[in-house]
From Swiss-Prot:
InterPro entries: Phage_lambda_portal
GO cellular component terms listed in the entry, alphabetical order: viral capsid
Alphabetized UniProt keyword annotations: Capsid protein, DNA-binding, Viral capsid assembly, Viral contractile tail ejection system, Viral genome ejection through host cell envelope, Viral genome packaging, Viral penetration into host cytoplasm, Viral release from host cell, Virion, Virus entry into host cell
Residue stretches in coiled coil: none
Pfam families per the UniProt record, alphabetical: Phage_portal_2
Family of the protein in this entry: Belongs to the siphoviridae portal protein family.
Compartmental location: Virion
Entry protein name: Probable portal protein
Function comment: Forms the portal vertex of the capsid. This portal plays critical roles in head assembly, genome packaging, neck/tail attachment, and genome ejection. The portal protein multimerizes as a single ring-shaped homododecamer arranged around a central channel. Binds to the terminase subunits to form the packaging machine.
Subunit structure: Homododecamer. Interacts with the terminase complex composed of two small and one large terminase subunits.
Organism: Halomonas phage phiHAP-1 (isolate -/Gulf of Mexico/-/2001)
Keyword match Nuclease: no
């Protein structure tokens, strides 16, 4: 038995040695959110409800029409929204528009001034009212005003180019509201492309064509019984919107982040205005004592006791009230003392959402120092410069290229095919701004030129001027001053830079130097 017990014990130990050690029971880790932004508590349930994991088109699709219609309503009835669109018109496009400048070159690489002059003059003619737009209502400047207004308000705008248009250049533009691009049109096509909210795209999400309704959905004068679409190729029509996310097919209003605050501010201000108006009109109330006055409507009472007191008020007069009637002044607290600071804080939020500074959006320069005004002005100008470059890349470069092609085909521009690349380059010059502090900014520009960290041409471009135009104008001024015997104001500047002579025109060859100095 002792032998058997020892054998059993040895067998048991051998089995334990071969088997793996027992693993402890798995314990699931406790997960905690590291980012406060991702935590879900009772205090941010509303935020969680607004979150959405859909793609860009899915998110835009649900609210697209509501966003557009509410933005249009505010553009009509809200002074702050109207101010925002006016600021874009003034600062992005400007009073004279974004100017086209030809950069044609001769075969030797120097500027072809004659060709540049011809191209720019023809474009100016085309830009006049009645030439550039299919309706004949707009000049190119007013067309761009409408374009930037529509882009910011609706979030998207379409421009169609019409080749072989019956004008001198065979070219015109048509601006189209995005209502005609059917948001509900989403399907796959037999050619393998798909339509997302009216935009036909290929497998790489490149726009191929746009499916437009033949009439505006809000046109109450002419609405066909059955809606039909027209397919416009993408090389004829450009849909412009400010991209928010990748894979996005449509845009939405630029005012979306501040529109809700703007709505409440307008409602609050309107209510305060009405309350203040009523308080100014209503000075007080008459109270009747039942012991002295008969009940209104009593047949035995006099006409004067019917509860109606006829008032005729004039300066320096007083009235004796009937017995039992006392006057109780109405103490109106509107507008409240919190009206101004609350409105100011709310408009600051709106300005932060829209883009321009609060001082510009609200027309409020109260308490603004010169240094803070200068800092804010520079930052705000960068905001407009970004939109200027967006307009150039999205629309103007495309318009310039097609206009050049159509003008050459119509024979307006005599450009041989072999010189196309040399004669057709153009540059778009957006509006600039004057210096906020002329003396300091002028000294800084001078220092930049002297230290070779800046150029005269770049300084001129920042002010919205073409350097070639400025140089030619200065040269012409000098010749004109000399011809008319007027002292030359450029003399000191030219002498300081070592310039003592400017080549005169042919008719001035026998006259002394044109700098106005001896």
């Amino acid at each position: 038995m002792g032998l058997l017990k020892r054998a059993a014990r040895a067998w048991k130990l051998a089995g334990q040695a071969d088997s793996p050690p027992a693993q402890p029971a798995r314990k699931e880790p406790t997960l905690t959110r590291t980012f406060k932004m991702a935590r879900q508590t009772r205090l941010n349930n509303s935020w969680t409800g607004r979150s959405n994991a859909g793609d860009a088109d899915h998110v835009i699709y649900k609210d697209h029409e509501t966003l557009r219609q509410r933005a249009r309503e505010q553009s009509i009835n809200s002074g702050y929204a109207k101010r925002f669109y006016r600021l874009l018109r003034q600062n992005v496009i400007g009073p004279h528009g974004i100017t086209m400048r030809s950069k044609a070159l001769k075969a030797d690489g120097y500027a072809d001034d004659d060709m540049r002059r011809v191209i720019e003059q023809e474009f100016k003619k085309w830009s006049k009212r009645g030439n550039c737009d299919v309706t004949g209502r707009y000049s190119f400047v007013t067309f761009m005003w409408l374009w930037i207004d529509t882009l910011a308000r609706d979030g998207e705008v379409m421009v169609r180019i019409l080749r072989n248009w019956p004008n001198r250049w065979g070219f015109a533009l048509q601006i189209i509201e995005s209502d005609l691009l059917d948001t509900t049109l989403n399907t796959w096509l037999s050619n393998g492309n798909r339509v997302r909210m009216g935009v036909e795209i290929d497998e790489w999400e490149k726009p191929i064509a746009y499916w437009l309704k033949r009439s505006h959905p809000g046109d109450n004068f002419e609405r066909p019984a059955e809606q039909e679409y027209q397919r416009i190729p993408a090389d004829e029509l450009r849909l412009t919107f400010d991209p928010w996310r990748p894979h996005q097919s449509r845009g939405f209003t630029w005012t979306h982040a501040g529109a809700n605050d703007l709505h409440h501010v307008e409602e609050y201000a309107g209510a305060e205005l009405i309350a203040a108006e009523q308080g100014a009109k209503l000075t007080g109330f008459y109270e009747q004592d039942a012991e002295w006055v008969d009940p209104p409507g009593d047949e035995d009472s006099d006409d004067a006791d019917q509860g109606v007191i006829i008032e005729e008020i004039e300066a320096g007069s007083a009235r004796l009230l009937p017995y039992g009637v006392t006057f109780k002044p109405y103490d109106n607290k509107h507008p409240s003392t919190n009206f101004a600071p609350f409105t100011k804080a709310a408009v600051r939020r709106i300005a932060g959402a829209f883009g321009p500074s609060y001082n510009r959006l609200a027309h409020d320069l109260e308490g603004v120092s010169f240094s803070s005004l200068r800092s804010g002005e520079i930052d705000e100008r960068d905001f407009y410069k970004c939109i200027q470059q967006f307009a150039i890349s999205e629309l103007l470069e495309w318009v310039g290229e097609v206009w050049m092609e159509c003008s050459m085909l119509k024979g307006v521009l005599k450009i041989p095919p072999r010189a196309w690349d040399r004669l057709t380059p153009i540059e778009w010059l957006p509006r600039g701004w004057d210096w906020v502090d002329p003396k300091k900014d002028s000294d800084a520009a001078k220092t930049g030129i002297e230290t070779l960290t800046d150029s005269v041409s770049d300084i001129m471009r920042r002010k919205g001027r073409d350097p070639d135009d400025v140089y030619n104008q200065i040269s012409e001024d000098i010749r004109r001053f000399k011809r008319l015997g007027i002292p030359n104001p450029y003399g000191k500047a030219l002498q300081a830079n070592g310039v003592t002579h400017v080549e005169p025109d042919e008719e001035d060859d026998d006259e002394p130097n044109a700098t106005g100095t001896d």
